Amino acid sequence: LVVSCGDLSYYYLEYIISSLDIPLYYIRGNHAKSIEYGIAGSRKSPWGAIDLHRKVLRDPKTGLLLAGIEGSLRYNKGIHQYTQSEMWSMVLNLIPSLLWNKVRFGRYLDIFVTHAPPWGIHDQSDVAHQGIKAFNWLIKTFQPAMHIHGHIHVYYPSVVTETIVGNTLVLNTTAIVN
């Protein structure tokens, strides 16, 4: 399966789906538009992709348990920007599904997908790039195997992009690949 952590065009995600012919799960980044326009028409989401925002899902082929939250911390009233309180609300709303996963599958979550990073992990000091405090709590409480995020663009190989928190690998997917 393929996972997108936001700020990629719907047309690009559709290209990946059609080229690889495998499921693509995504969340939107802070730069996502409400509607994208292109030669194939307008759309509110990528055709064939699975939106993870505020959802907990099980991939039928791999059995992986995924959950996601879109956007970043609010800094200019963009449509995919939220306050810390709003992020807390979204995280807390995932709890019933995570508990049900534990009953059904013996684990809460395998992969937590977000655009923004957790607070104090891979984030930056400016408001637009600060991490989300509720994500730290989710990681510590439900211990997914991975938390993958985008948003923090990495231009130098010396920047830390992988961090272990308890049993969770936190991975910045915007890193340079050497």
Where are these regions (language model features)?
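Active-site neighborhood of phospho(di)ester-bond hydrolases with catalytic His/Asp-centered motifs
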Residues: 2-7, 24-30, 52, 111-115, ...
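Short, structured coil segments at secondary-structure junctions
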Residues: 19-20, 47, 165-168
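A short, gly/pro- and small-residue-rich
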Residues: 20-29, 130-135
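Conserved catalytic scaffold of divalent metal-dependent phosphoesterases
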Residues: 15, 28-34, 38-130
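Binuclear metal-dependent phosphoesterase catalytic core
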Residues: 56-62, 138-142, 155-178
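A short acidic, amphipathic alpha-helical/loop segment
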Residues: 12-19, 39, 134, 138
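Short, well-ordered alpha-helical microsegments
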Residues: 10-14, 155-157
